[in-house]
């Protein structure tokens, strides 16, 4: 079996370690950073010179790029898919359905990663042939098929992300004010008393992660906004969240 990754960031490099020495893991690092190239080389991943050949020679293609790039990647390389194309990007069901214009529905799996990829996570999947992805379980990758329609997995992911990203934005503002007042330690102490230590650890993790991945978070929030609008609902909280992450990105 040959598993090809389009994009080789945190998600792909972590997943690739489940398959190491068991299947042929491959990617293309054309246009990628030196850091990404070094990681791919260190992990012993087979490197293709271009994405077209990578896709043509993969039994399972996993697209793990940025939300704003997901559709463009499918447009360029979807026609070369011979096996299964798995989109794990945090994009709205609308974007996943747009991808179907470029990839046969029989070959497409809508997939979302729930949890932290470097800790405890699972991949929820939907699509006509989502069950074919269950083969990855024998390598230790937790797969849960939740439906046969494209959009079901990404809908759940959008709802979860609406909660987590909005919570992160609130925490960023709370910690910003506390820092300005010199009351970070006191705030953490009170939060630990009322919410528990696990919540405090979660707060710290979300705040740090928001700065590290601010650009990607912003793109994900734009997808959440589209998701809300598609259901004829007014995005209120998510607009504030979007402004917060735009502010971080511009700092």
From Swiss-Prot:
Record-linked Gene3D superfamilies: N-(1-d-carboxylethyl)-l-norvaline Dehydrogenase, domain 2, NAD(P)-binding Rossmann-like Domain
Source superkingdom: Archaea
SUPFAM superfamilies reported in the protein's UniProt record: 6-phosphogluconate dehydrogenase C-terminal domain-like (SSF48179), NAD(P)-binding Rossmann-fold domains (SSF51735)
InterPro entries per UniProt: 6-PGluconate_DH-like_C_sf, 6PGD_dom2, NAD(P)-bd_dom_sf, P5C_Rdtase_cat_N, Pgluconate_DH_NAD-bd_C
Name this protein carries in UniProt: Uncharacterized 28.5 kDa protein in 7S RNA 5'region
